[in-house]
Amino acid sequence: MSTDHSPDPLLLTKAETLVEALPYMQRYAGETFVVKYGGHAMGDPEAARDFAEDIVLLKAVGINPVVVHGGGPQIGKMLKTLGVESRFVDGLRVTDAETARVAEMVLCGSINKEIVSWIAQAGGRAVGLSGKDGRMVVAEKVRRTQRDPDSNIEKAVDLGFVGEPADIDRRVIDTISKAGMIPVVAPIAIGEDGHTYNVNADTMAGAIAIALGAARLFLLTDVAGVLDKEKKLIRDLTPRQINALREDGTIQGGMIPKLETCVHAVEGGVDAAVILDGRVPHAMLIEAFTRRGAGTLIGMG
């Protein structure tokens, strides 16, 4: 018979993790975390379960999580099924009336309710809504220009029903959070003209984070964070450093608008924004509750 009474090393590790997390839990109790969950991060059911468990845990330790989700790939798939061609300008989907209807159907009727269901299965209570509900997010039309290659003249491009938040009424989210539930927001908004507008999910999350005075804005995506020229993760950045990395070409492509959202958020009063890989198990908890963190944290320095 074994006389070894030493604790299980795995249990010790778990206990040490909790001890390390405690000061962070105390620090963030009562604060708001806005979490943007990208459409590209939704493909793995196991990762979806991990995400839902993380959100429920945040709520359980006294943090108020607010989920804003994307759904670009899913919208594109539905449009293809319906025989509707997708066209993009500066990464924004050109949205005519038919595309706007499809986007609202996919985002509000499918993805939003799926995330609410994940959270319920993880033991939480979530309420799905869009920016249209209670006129929570009023959008204004996004305007873009493109240089004509023949005339070399900048010309206006009509993106259709693509909007950006002009005004946010936080009362709907506050009411849900104070009731002990978790708001899950689809990036659809109402315009002053009464039309429905499709809003970039990163932009929506950043605007909501500013309106709520969030402690953290998390952008969960399918990359580890911001990488340097050697493809190594950059753990901390300030707006000034981001400008320098853009100028020398280190930051390119789709990472630029994400960082613009982060900079806008921290300049608007959000304590910090983080870009991290939503496919990594419990990456958000690692970022929030450990010294090392995960992903790239953007702050004012």
Curated annotation (Swiss-Prot):
Q: Which residues are involved in binding substrate?
A: G71, G72, R93, N198
Instruction: Quote the SUPFAM superfamilies the UniProt record gives.
Output: Carbamate kinase-like (SSF53633)
EC number annotated for this UniProt entry:
2.7.2.8
* Similarity remark: Belongs to the acetylglutamate kinase family. ArgB subfamily.
Species classification: Bacteria, Pseudomonadati, Pseudomonadota, Alphaproteobacteria, Sphingomonadales
Query: What organism is recorded for this protein?
Result: Rhizorhabdus wittichii (strain DSM 6014 / CCUG 31198 / JCM 15750 / NBRC 105917 / EY 4224 / RW1) (Sphingomonas wittichii)
**Subcellular location, in the record's words?**
Cytoplasm
Q: Which domain of life is it from?
A: Bacteria
Q: Which gene encodes it?
A: argB
Annotated function: Catalyzes the ATP-dependent phosphorylation of N-acetyl-L-glutamate.
From the UniProt record, give the pathway where this protein acts: Amino-acid biosynthesis; L-arginine biosynthesis; N(2)-acetyl-L-ornithine from L-glutamate: step 2/4
Which coarse location class applies to the principal site listed for this UniProt protein? cytoplasm
Q: Which UniProt keywords apply?
A: Amino-acid biosynthesis, Arginine biosynthesis, ATP-binding, Cytoplasm, Kinase, Nucleotide-binding, Transferase
Residues flagged as site, Transition state stabilizer: K36, K258
Gene Ontology terms describing biological process = arginine biosynthetic process via ornithine; L-arginine biosynthetic process
Question: Does this UniProt record's set of keywords contain Kinase?
Answer: yes
Q: Where does it sit, as one GO cellular component term?
A: cytoplasm
InterPro entries given for it? Answer: AceGlu_kinase-like_sf, AcgluKinase_fam, ArgB, Asp/Glu/Uridylate_kinase, Glu/AcGlu_kinase, NAGK-C
| Reactions performed catalytically | N-acetyl-L-glutamate + ATP = N-acetyl-L-glutamyl 5-phosphate + ADP
Root EC class:
transferase
Pfam families from the xrefs?
Answer: AA_kinase
The protein depicted here goes by the name Acetylglutamate kinase
The coiled-coil segments of this chain are: none
